[in-house]
Amino acid sequence: RQRQMCIRDSMKSIIEGERALCFWLSQQTEVSLYHSDEKIRREASELVSLMTPVVKSMFTDLGMEITSDAMQIFGGYGYTKDQGIEQLYRDNRITPIYEGTNSVQAIDLVFRKLVNKESDIINRYIESLKKDLSSKNQELKNFNEKLENSLKTLIKFTDWIKDKMQKSKNDVSAACND
């Protein structure tokens, strides 16, 4: 019983995080289309372009994980047609393939958006996150520490990608889906 509660709480937190990210990306899309300042519209459009494949891949991969967890909650019965979870699992299995497989989206992200000579979208995004981290709000202290560690990983990976792009694009292609 305890394991089922842990799985359910994990599923709930993933879904709520995805929902918040979806709202944020939708807001950026609105800004990119309707803001009165051309520069702000362009920056929002670039941010949407950068984040859309990340969000698509994350949502579809985690959707598969959540559906699998839902099936596990029911044990052997989850695999049968009685509960309907098996149908959800089958229906969800196609989502990483729709609109370009997650692997193809990852290659496009890295080769066309992450290492973009015309505009350095990723660095502007990182700078905006650093600015958000500078908040001295004590309620966000634990969250900010975790975000800062994740940001360091993102910077390290981005620098690695940019360095490898100069030397071996095959290494970069192999790392795209990670």
Region spans (language model):
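Short, small-residue-biased leader/transition segments that mark boundaries at the very start
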Residues: 2-7
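Charged, amphipathic alpha-helical oligomerization/scaffolding segments
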Residues: 10, 14-17, 54, 58-65, ...
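A generic secondary-structure signal for well-formed alpha-helical elements
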Residues: 15-33, 63-66, 70, 74, ...
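C-terminal helix-coil-helix/basic helical segment that borders enzyme active sites and/or dimer interfaces
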Residues: 16-56, 158-177
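Short coil/turn segments at secondary-structure boundaries
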Residues: 22-24, 37-38, 74-77, 81-83, ...
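Alpha-helix capping/hinge segments and adjacent helical runs
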Residues: 24, 46-124
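Long, amphipathic alpha-helical stalk/connector segments used for oligomerization, subunit docking
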Residues: 110-113, 117-176
